[in-house]
């Protein structure tokens, strides 16, 4: 099973993603972070396979977290999960190292489909 870290300032969103992934029986949630600093620290400490990340956090933007993680050579697959759906933002996130981008709101099926795709790329 692949290890997943959830980075989102919304407790509801973290719980929703966690529940969806755990109920799939395919993923282990190794940690949750509500800020960018926590997300970076946990990514370095826990070495997750996949990171779900909100793009707008209280202390920094998800895109800046991605840049920091890639600079630190964290090779986890990163899926941005954000209410911001502007194509220019999506492209900027991908150019900075995001592997996928899912716009909120989304269905549980869409989340699992995207995470499954990233997990396959790890094999």
PLM feature spans:
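Two-component/phosphorelay signaling modules centered on CheY-like receiver
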Residues: 11-31
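Acidic catalytic/metal-coordinating carboxylates
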Residues: 35-38, 61-64
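Active-site beta3 strand of CheY-like receiver
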Residues: 46-52, 57
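The feature encodes the CheY-like receiver
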Residues: 58, 86
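Short amphipathic alpha-helix used as the core "switch/output" element in two-component signaling
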Residues: 63-74
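C-terminal output helix
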Residues: 88, 106-115
């Amino acid at each position: 099973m692949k290890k997943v870290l959830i980075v989102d300032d919304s407790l509801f969103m973290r719980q929703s993603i966690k529940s969806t992934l755990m109920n799939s029986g395919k993923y282990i949630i190794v940690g949750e972070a509500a800020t960018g600093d926590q997300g970076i620290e946990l990514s370095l400490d826990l070495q997750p396979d996949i990171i779900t990340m909100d793009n707008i956090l209280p202390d920094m933007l998800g895109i800046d977290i991605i840049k920091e993680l890639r600079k630190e050579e964290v090779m986890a697959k990163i899926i941005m999960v954000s209410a911001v759906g502007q194509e220019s933002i999506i492209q900027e996130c991908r150019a900075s190292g995001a592997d996928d981008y899912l716009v909120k709101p989304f269905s549980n099926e869409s989340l699992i489909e995207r995470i499954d795709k990233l997990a396959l790329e790890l094999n």
